[in-house]
Amino acid sequence: MSDQNKTKDYSKYFDFSDARVVSEDDEKKIIKIKGREITIYDQPNYRAGRKRKREDVQVLRPENLIPEEVANLGAGKKFLIRTYGCQMNVHDSENMSGLLLGMGFEETTETEEADIILLNTCAIRENAENKVFGEIGNLKPLKLEKPELIIGVCGCMSQEESVVGKIMEKHQHIDLIFGTHNIHRLPHLLRDAIFGKEMVIEVWSKEGDIVENMPRSRKNKTQAWVNIMYGCDKFCTYCIVPYTRGKERSRLPEDIIAEVRDLARQGYKEITLLGQNVNAYGKDLPGSYRLGDLMNEIHKIDIPRVRFTTSHPRDFDDHLIEVLAQGGNLVEHIHLPVQHGNSDILKLMGRKYTREQYITLANKIKQAIPNASFTTDLIVGFPNETEEQFQDMLSLVEEIQFDAAYTYIYSPREGTPAARMEDNVPMSVKKERLARLNALVNDISNKRNLDYQDKIVEVLVEGESKKNTDVLAGRTRTNRLVNFVGPKSAIGEIVYVKITEAKTWSLDGEIVSAPEVKAQ
């Protein structure tokens, strides 16, 4: 355990005056709070998490991440993972599931059946954290009823100092806390939590190495997430991600391509390349190999659809645009978060581009890929946002004509520069602005969807509609949701659908045969 984390003091968050150190060595520290022993291997530290050293990131290829002594630890037992937040968390949960299945556990969807419950958390907004703490509280009666139940908290919230402090003091029915950098250590940590009976904490503030050969249990047999890089170095002033996910680290191209080829052999129809800042891919690798080069190679692999997320405008280069314009399995959907439409606010956000630069980039992409759908993220109510600045956001949305947008009220994140800014905008004003923004976004989305009326589109069928099990649902290449009546055998397949009704957020249609498609 590092000296920095040995001396970490959580007293600024909670009252640990009754805590006492039971034992301490170079590997771990054991403390006792309110009668429960807590084994701490490492604790979150924002200062350490912010550092960006030029140390080489090692690529580890362990033959087996599951020690022999725990290989059958889960025999006759079940696990449940609840996943909050982004696609990266979904991917991480697939890795955790793979490890637990390798230890002999079975997966369940029933809380009462579970012997292990892991909450894979999101820290991007306060609302997400409140949901997790609500669930932590809801699980306490079950823990009292089943003392042998192991409850773990992992993901981005675990990387926050205040969250770990709150759990240590107020939620002592939690048995295990680990972070985003040491998922591969889950079998070891679980062993300690089960046999040691104390709360176990291991959260690395400094990112770990890239671990290949992770066992993985993919729930979806049609669409797959493929991590191509980890972390973010942008440090936007409102964002906690660089602290919770660490510095940018790219997987080697040959490892990514091998994974994509394997997915193609398994019959997957769609992959999404993942990264917190996906188009910064390759900047930390030797040479000039970038996302455009990777996409160009994947373009040649026999897999019908390839997506990527999430992009930062600063890293969207001309070569990437040229590659995407080839089409083929590279779908016509660009998600490019702008966050705001006013250059002064963008500067305060630390985005390092202006409104005009974003518009120029968007127009360049649209010119190269005319049929592309364009989606974005928007934050309303950044500290001291004026009505005039908000109007700039509305006018940007009008000018770009986004097909859809994820809109949010600014949520301060502890430890970020924006959280220290004074804010004179009342919440009532922020909510009213969000409503106005959503009305505009919905209106444009509806108009854009009307362009699909009576057209035949290619749809990858994802499953039954959430609203009606007699209806199937899937997505177009441009990521529009399409609902239609069809045979269950179509699930997981690519079909053609004629659009009969365009709605604000979805399209309704009827399945058509291949000859009709050719006729059109």
Swiss-Prot record:
<keyword id="KW-0411">Iron-sulfur</keyword>
<dbReference type="InterPro" id="IPR006463">
    <property type="entry name" value="MiaB_methiolase"/>
</dbReference>
<dbReference type="GO" id="GO:0051539">
    <property type="term" value="F:4 iron, 4 sulfur cluster binding"/>
</dbReference>
<dbReference type="Pfam" id="PF04055">
    <property type="entry name" value="Radical_SAM"/>
</dbReference>
<keyword id="KW-0408">Iron</keyword>
<comment type="similarity">
    <text>Belongs to the methylthiotransferase family. MiaB subfamily.</text>
</comment>
<dbReference type="InterPro" id="IPR020612">
    <property type="entry name" value="Methylthiotransferase_CS"/>
</dbReference>
<feature type="domain" description="MTTase N-terminal">
    <location>
        <begin position="77"/>
        <end position="195"/>
    </location>
</feature>
<keyword id="KW-0963">Cytoplasm</keyword>
<keyword id="KW-0479">Metal-binding</keyword>
<comment type="function">
    <text>Catalyzes the methylthiolation of N6-(dimethylallyl)adenosine (i(6)A), leading to the formation of 2-methylthio-N6-(dimethylallyl)adenosine (ms(2)i(6)A) at position 37 in tRNAs that read codons beginning with uridine.</text>
</comment>
<keyword id="KW-0808">Transferase</keyword>
<keyword id="KW-0004">4Fe-4S</keyword>
<feature type="binding site">
    <location>
        <position position="239"/>
    </location>
    <ligand>
        <name>[4Fe-4S] cluster 2</name>
    </ligand>
</feature>
<dbReference type="InterPro" id="IPR038135">
    <property type="entry name" value="Methylthiotransferase_N_sf"/>
</dbReference>
<dbReference type="InterPro" id="IPR013848">
    <property type="entry name" value="Methylthiotransferase_N"/>
</dbReference>
<keyword id="KW-0819">tRNA processing</keyword>
<feature type="binding site">
    <location>
        <position position="156"/>
    </location>
    <ligand>
        <name>[4Fe-4S] cluster 1</name>
    </ligand>
</feature>
<dbReference type="Pfam" id="PF00919">
    <property type="entry name" value="UPF0004"/>
</dbReference>
<dbReference type="GO" id="GO:0046872">
    <property type="term" value="F:metal ion binding"/>
</dbReference>
<dbReference type="InterPro" id="IPR002792">
    <property type="entry name" value="TRAM_dom"/>
</dbReference>
<feature type="domain" description="TRAM">
    <location>
        <begin position="450"/>
        <end position="513"/>
    </location>
</feature>
<feature type="binding site">
    <location>
        <position position="236"/>
    </location>
    <ligand>
        <name>[4Fe-4S] cluster 2</name>
    </ligand>
</feature>
<feature type="binding site">
    <location>
        <position position="86"/>
    </location>
    <ligand>
        <name>[4Fe-4S] cluster 1</name>
    </ligand>
</feature>
<comment type="subunit">
    <text>Monomer.</text>
</comment>
<dbReference type="InterPro" id="IPR006638">
    <property type="entry name" value="Elp3/MiaA/NifB-like_rSAM"/>
</dbReference>
<keyword id="KW-0949">S-adenosyl-L-methionine</keyword>
<feature type="binding site">
    <location>
        <position position="122"/>
    </location>
    <ligand>
        <name>[4Fe-4S] cluster 1</name>
    </ligand>
</feature>
<feature type="domain" description="Radical SAM core">
    <location>
        <begin position="218"/>
        <end position="448"/>
    </location>
</feature>
<dbReference type="Pfam" id="PF01938">
    <property type="entry name" value="TRAM"/>
</dbReference>
<dbReference type="InterPro" id="IPR005839">
    <property type="entry name" value="Methylthiotransferase"/>
</dbReference>
<protein>
    <recommendedName>
        <fullName>tRNA-2-methylthio-N(6)-dimethylallyladenosine synthase</fullName>
        <ecNumber>2.8.4.3</ecNumber>
    </recommendedName>
</protein>
<dbReference type="InterPro" id="IPR023404">
    <property type="entry name" value="rSAM_horseshoe"/>
</dbReference>
<dbReference type="InterPro" id="IPR007197">
    <property type="entry name" value="rSAM"/>
</dbReference>
<dbReference type="GO" id="GO:0005829">
    <property type="term" value="C:cytosol"/>
</dbReference>
<feature type="binding site">
    <location>
        <position position="232"/>
    </location>
    <ligand>
        <name>[4Fe-4S] cluster 2</name>
    </ligand>
</feature>
<dbReference type="GO" id="GO:0035597">
    <property type="term" value="F:N6-isopentenyladenosine methylthiotransferase activity"/>
</dbReference>
